């Protein structure tokens, strides 16, 4: 395992966990070997919960402590390159939130690619038709290839028979 090619990813709450690992400092267990970073080298986030602030997902649960666990409120220089995939009709994660996240990432000099899928909602990639699973898999492949984490042409394409 190449420790310089660790990718964290997830959808929805899993995307929150991955983004937290990449952006929030101080989550290490004091008993672990702190010489080994637990910060991933890249993030792949599908309709991620990245804002836990007022009027956002999870705020009622965390209230004033949201800044401790809200990825969008913890972006800093050195944040890992990130790919975000989301539907334009997501009723849980507003597109404006992921656009703000992308802006914040660019402000600190970190790469953040955003791919919008027209007229689909939350978790669109995990529901029929299979075309969205294929399309998101292709985008992830291209992103990881652009980072040289994988090489070669994608083995899947948008014309895949599903």
Sequence positions of predicted segments:
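Primarily recognizes the serine-hydrolase "nucleophile elbow" in alpha/beta-hydrolase
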Residues: 1-62, 66-67, 71
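Hydrophobic anchor at the start of a short beta-strand
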Residues: 6, 82, 112
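Conserved alpha/beta-hydrolase "acid-adjacent" motif
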Residues: 91-100
């Amino acid at each position: 395992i190449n420790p310089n090619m660790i990718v964290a990813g997830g959808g929805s709450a899993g995307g929150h966990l991955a983004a937290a690992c990449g952006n929030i400092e101080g989550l290490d267990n004091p008993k672990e070997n702190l010489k080994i970073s637990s910060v991933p080298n890249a993030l792949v986030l599908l309709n991620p919960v990245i804002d836990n602030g007022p009027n956002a997902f999870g705020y009622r649960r965390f209230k004033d402590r949201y800044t401790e666990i809200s990825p969008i409120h913890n972006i800093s220089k050195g944040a890992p390159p990130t790919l975000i995939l989301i539907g334009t009709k997501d009723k849980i994660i507003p597109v404006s939130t992921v656009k703000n996240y992308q802006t914040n990432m660019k402000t600190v000099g970190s790469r953040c690619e955003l791919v919008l899928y027209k007229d689909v909602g939350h978790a669109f990639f995990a529901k029929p038709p299979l075309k969205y699973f294929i399309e998101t898999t292709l985008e992830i492949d291209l992103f990881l290839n652009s980072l040289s984490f994988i090489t070669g042409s994608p083995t899947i394409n948008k014309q895949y028979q599903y």
